């Protein structure tokens, strides 16, 4: 893992970025003026505020932070622990990009619609319904992309576990295993 071009480093980097965004989001949403505004628009029990807190905040931390980290760690450790090469580098890359795009799309969809509908709730409530018309398809698209990333991950792990073990010489050390184990 000495090289920054390691195929799994992107999982770690985006996990850290996601935790930073989620932490900043969490700190901002408890500041009294922001918390008051969120409470007036329905957070955390419904309404536009619910999109910002807890939906956007939780998904950034859980999917962007924890899930991407867990996926990267699994891809790193599985060859070492099982003696099997990760079945597909393409599926590994698809796992990362689909999960990342889905999670960030979901986050920004929740934030964008939450803020827009929250502002409209106080100034022009009649504009919420036409705006909300686009919310369902947008969040469904992002969720589907995220789910496709999860599916690629599960398929790749299953194919790896069902494959034949590689000779132990291929999995020499913790440092070299992922490089030699990812095709």
Residue ranges and their predicted role:
Residues 1-183:
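Hydrophobic alpha-helical transmembrane segments of multi-pass integral membrane proteins
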């Amino acid at each position: 893992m000495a090289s920054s071009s390691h195929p799994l480093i992107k999982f770690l980097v985006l996990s850290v970025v996601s935790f930073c965004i989620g932490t900043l989001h969490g700190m901002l949403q408890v500041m009294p003026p922001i918390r008051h505004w969120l409470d007036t628009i329905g957070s955390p029990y419904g309404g536009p505020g619910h999109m910002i807190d807890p939906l956007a905040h939780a998904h950034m931390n859980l999917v962007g932070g924890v899930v991407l980290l867990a996926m990267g760690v699994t891809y790193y450790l599985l060859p070492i622990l099982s003696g099997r090469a990760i079945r597909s580098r393409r599926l590994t890359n698809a796992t990362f990009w689909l999960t990342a795009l889905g999670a960030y799309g979901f986050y920004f969809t929740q934030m964008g619609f939450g803020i827009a509908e929250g502002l409209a709730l106080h100034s022009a409530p009649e504009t919420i319904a036409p705006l909300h018309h686009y919310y369902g398809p947008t969040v469904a698209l992002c969720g589907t992309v995220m789910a496709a990333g999860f599916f690629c991950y599960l398929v790749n792990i299953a194919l790896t576990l069902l494959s034949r073990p590689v000779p132990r010489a291929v999995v020499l050390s913790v440092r070299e295993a992922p490089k030699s184990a990812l095709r």
